[in-house]
Amino acid sequence: MAVSLWQQCIGRLQDELSAQQFSMWIRPLQAQMDGDTLVLYAPNRFVLDWVRDKYINIINQFFTEQMGSDAPKLRFDIGSRPSAPRPVQATAAVERPKFEQNTKPAKTSFNVNSPEPAMAANHRSNINRTYQFENFVEGKSNQLGKAAAMQVAENPGGAYNPLFLYGGTGLGKTHLLHAVGNGIIKNNPNAKVVYMHSERFVQDMVKALQNNAIEEFKRYYRSVDALFIDDIQFFANKDRSQEEFFHTFNALLEGNHQIILTSDKYPKEIDGVEDRLKSRFGWGLTVAIEPPELETRVAILMRKAQESGINLPDEVAFFIAKRLRSNVRELEGALNRVIANANFTGRPITIDFVREALRDLLALQEKLVTIDNIQKTVAEYYKIKMADMLSKRRSRSVARPRQVAMALSKELTNHSLPEIGDAFGGRDHTTVLHACRKIAQLREESHDTKEDYANLIRTLSS
């Protein structure tokens, strides 16, 4: 009785939560009765704690409404429901669309003696063992992506299939792909895990066509256990490649074989890609990987310095992190330059030394990101007038973008709160502080605000 009501509860949660929240937190749960207790199994500690903190009241309220005093007790546990041939999982009320081609994944692997043996190279060797979950620096900007990736590594082909990670360059998407691959291979050394850039898929298909080996190409890609494709946006306007990937995608998903894709944009925003593909990209879980916040940037620098055997003073790490905000790759490149200069000159790494070593990079960053530039970018994004940034108007359509611009100015520039207030029509520092706190709160509560803020960060940092 309680387990069947859990399915009804799932329907309630699906109505009340966003698609991403439902896919991320509710879909992976499995339910089983243990006496008078309904046990909800979560795939990992992160999901368990989140559901217990955020959704326990909604779940309890639903069961009380349906069963009154007979409502079961709830208990959370980590793992899979034991002795269950087919776990009761959270499934969407609306069924996934039927595949347009009902193709079973072929069992034969790609013939290395075919006319184009290079295409059948051991792609598993492309999984970089350096990239592990253990050395992925986690912060608010990427914790959902990491949690989803870890779940995929433990349960490939399960709830998050496909997993779609999107965000700007150098934010750690590729690191997570390799970490998942390493996790899958660790649990199953015989797993056929293929990682590649989307352009490699296109090149392989072109070679197969040239060598009359397209059937071998199809068999190879449809027989893998996990397929990870980086920068899927490069499929844009390549119609034949999209057609072939469409059928490969269908075959792999029908066989419960894991697919992970990355892009620099949200699936529906990718130009030049067929709607039927963009629709499929969103069937599983879509997660944004955002630019790292200050604390995460500092942690990345400290981790990188430690790996390089360098003692990086805290104040130096904060100095660099406050000025370079766009992506991890930029941070690591700057630190490598500092380390190289220190090794060459024999000088200690101090703030003054970093100013000198990164003089051109810091000057460029300060030139690119100004309060004026932020105001113009935000005004254009929200389709308001630049003058509204400085006006006293308090309507939400104007006040909210103004608050976003203030928060971005605090995060992306080195100006003080009073200086930011002056730039916004002579407002005082308490107004700026309130705006920063309000936007931080909305980023936690509103998916739209979170997306808008991330989009603006990417635009201003590019």
From Swiss-Prot:
ATP binds at G170, G172, K173, T174. Residues 126-342 are annotated as: Domain III, AAA+ region. InterPro entries: AAA+_ATPase (IPR003593), Chromosome_initiator_DnaA (IPR001957), Chromosome_initiator_DnaA-like (IPR020591), Chromosome_initiator_DnaA_CS (IPR018312), DnaA_C (IPR013159), DnaA_dom (IPR013317), DnaA_N_dom (IPR024633), DnaA_N_sf (IPR038454). Residues 343-462 are annotated as: Domain IV, binds dsDNA. Residues 84-125 are annotated as: Domain II. Residues 1-84 are annotated as: Domain I, interacts with DnaA modulators. Keywords: ATP-binding, Cytoplasm, DNA replication, DNA-binding, Lipid-binding, Nucleotide-binding. One of its GO terms (cellular component) is plasma membrane. SUPFAM superfamilies: P-loop containing nucleoside triphosphate hydrolases, TrpR-like. One of its GO terms (molecular function) is ATP binding. GO terms for biological process: DNA replication initiation; regulation of DNA replication. It is found in: Cytoplasm. Oligomerizes as a right-handed, spiral filament on DNA at oriC. Plays an essential role in the initiation and regulation of chromosomal replication. ATP-DnaA binds to the origin of replication (oriC) to initiate formation of the DNA replication initiation complex once per cell cycle. Binds the DnaA box (a 9 base pair repeat at the origin) and separates the double-stranded (ds)DNA. Forms a right-handed helical filament on oriC DNA; dsDNA binds to the exterior of the filament while single-stranded (ss)DNA is stabiized in the filament's interior. Domain I is involved in oligomerization and binding regulators, domain II is flexibile and of varying length in different bacteria, domain III forms the AAA+ region, while domain IV binds dsDNA. Belongs to the DnaA family. This is Chromosomal replication initiator protein DnaA. The gene is dnaA.
